[in-house]
């Protein structure tokens, strides 16, 4: 039998995801077998579980924190927005249906049963399960249909922590309002409050602590300091709104990323941020970097249409003529071909559209979705690297270019054990792949960065691998959480 703990929030981006990761790492370091859990997540950022199922990247990252293989049971229901108020619903890792909100709520009981199945599985196999809620736990217009917050605590008999972000202001009002809008049966599940992202002397909060406990009969059990040095993957595209430049601001290597309207799996870029200056560009911006990344997207045809509308397609060809390096990942890779065939409008309202015509390749969209972990040998001219990643794509591609990767496991372009395309036009290198996570492979990432440095006659660099940096930050987070929160009322 597992002990269940739940972290709910007063709002989105209050710190739930990071707090769950920190608690998972803290408990596993104490010798327990720990699992993260989020009953329902909405995100275009997803990864592949050990069962070859699709789960949100947040629960994948939390599994890393817990030092366990990521499972479909950590995120039984995943909603992937497609536009026009429609989401693709993923249940236990596999596509279920495309649904709007009204259709989804009519099948709420079905999803609840799947959530219960996962709770039962986790209860039997772990010592602790740390649950993450979604958004605000008290959207009073949605409470009857909310299967992502305190309903889950009720089902799992979990003790709940309410976290609020003081950096936004109004933290005590947010806590008080949330508690007093909750039904009594859910209010009783709250065992403590945690205040996140505090800067300064904690003494200034003590009067507030006393008053909020007096008003709610629930104590503040922790205050987490604001720490800008932590490097952890972001959960969804809301985190990159307004974000323009990040990474190593002193690096001589500049990477531009097209900020697609339906950008997905942008955590693919994280491994480069230690070595490179990273810059998002809009469709009407100039390309100023050494490397241009066309990232994953939920709607490749929509992005291709926007690139044409704002003239980015022409700028990309100019960039190639100047010797630029281009890297397309999944949906971004598809746009590099001659044509994207979407007769059933499965990608959006654009339909079939001509591509950038960099690769001699045709991509056709259908109903089948590749969801799998993949590995193989990546070959560039006389260089070879062992690489691994994961695939999440609905299109299949017929490419007449040199394959980038020979797969030993995976689907790739066409299910023929070849993935991606590679082309060199004079001093310009163009790479394309369906493999997300490919930049987590240190040797290939190092090759890509040093390709730019060699063009500039600069010394090669070799930083710590991404996995090592991530693990170090998980341990740092765990220490902060353990020192900041009194768990005596929870554990």
Curated annotation (Swiss-Prot):
Keywords, A to Z, come to: Cobalamin biosynthesis, Glutamine amidotransferase
Pathway participation: Cofactor biosynthesis; adenosylcobalamin biosynthesis
Q: Which InterPro entries match?
A: Class_I_gatase-like (IPR029062), CobQ/CobB/MinD/ParA_Nub-bd_dom (IPR002586), CobQ_GATase1 (IPR033949), CobQ_N (IPR047045), CobQ_synth (IPR004459), GATase_3 (IPR011698), P-loop_NTPase (IPR027417)
What domain of life is recorded for the organism? Archaea
Q: Which GO terms describe its biological process?
A: cobalamin biosynthetic process
Q: Which HAMAP family match?
A: CobQ (MF_00028)
- Give the protein name, as stated in the record: Probable cobyric acid synthase
Top-level taxonomy? Archaea, Methanobacteriati, Methanobacteriota, Methanomada group, Methanococci
